[in-house]
Amino acid sequence: MIRIAIDCMGGDFGLPVTIPAAIEFARQFPDTRLLLVGLPDAIEAALAERRDAPRDRLDIVPATEVVSMDDPVEVALRRKKDSSMRLAAQAVKDGRADACISAGNTGAWMAISRYVLKTLDGIDRPAIATSIPNQTGRATTVLDLGANVDCSAEHLLQFAIMGAALSQAVDHRDRPTVGLLNIGEEIIKGNEVVKEAAELLRASPLNFYGNVEGNDIFKGTVDVVVCDGFVGNVVLKSVEGLAKMLSSVIREEFKRNFITLLAGAFAKPVLNRLRNRVDNRRYNGAALLGLRGVVIKSHGSADAYAFGFALQRAREAVASKLLERTAQTVAQITQRVQSGEAVAPGAAGDTA
């Protein structure tokens, strides 16, 4: 039985999203048990509205406090010690849950998770990773997406190790290719940190492709794209904004007149397939990698449909033993890097 602790109070909408998503998820996956962490009376009231809730696999974990989207990290971490967010992470720490998930304040969730669970040996900083759909029909894993604004070359190497482990475990890629996000493919491009990181990656046992550019994320050039949190967050928000704009523009154009409405009716099957491929809700659920526990961050504005996919990401991470595989991969590669063992000739490429 896979056990997932949910911060039911987190996010822009809280219970109206988390409870319906939890119920649908529990019905879809009978091998899971969900710990619903939050204000008990409010959770009971929300569950009472759904007669189809599998109550035998929905356990309420009472909390007396809620971390709001506006709470400073210090307040969430130091003052609200009985918050639903804190207790969700604590459930993993205590072994009562295999994974935890929140749609709440990203900074607070990262700080609380790191404080409660600690980082893996060999990892200095956790990183946020998610999947972005590409033209191959698969997805590109991108990290870091905002946890670390300023990074050293060693941090980027650690992100690459964790991203490769995630791609292997969840996306089932035997030897994922890793690219370093840069302003050009050439070796001479980028700032000093990026150049140094490229050298470390080139000398590592990872399947390092070389420098990649922003368009390579959507082309599916590599399986994993590594960058610092500042750049990664800009990329993520740009992708989300572009997707919403294109969806809005397409709807407006098909509603322009009778001819376009008719064309839209004929094109509906194609448009539905396109929407399913690029719908960012289907890729909701970013993994906080590098911690001693499976931690998932849902988008704060996620609806119940999107939150359900974040729960699936948590389940997949546990089922694929992501934590164990990440720890093992980090230990193995860190040892090989420290011993000066380079990648075998021809195992990794470089486009420069």
UniProtKB/Swiss-Prot annotation:
GO terms for MF: phosphate:acyl-[acyl carrier protein] acyltransferase activity
Lipid metabolism as a keyword of this entry, yes or no, is yes
Name where it's found: Cytoplasm
Entry-linked InterPro entries: FA_synthesis, Phospholipid_synth_PlsX-like
Q: Name one GO biological process term.
A: phospholipid biosynthetic process
Please list the reactions this protein catalyses. Answer: a fatty acyl-[ACP] + phosphate = an acyl phosphate + holo-[ACP]
Instruction: Please give the name of this protein.
Output: Phosphate acyltransferase
- Species the sequence originates in: Bordetella parapertussis (strain 12822 / ATCC BAA-587 / NCTC 13253)
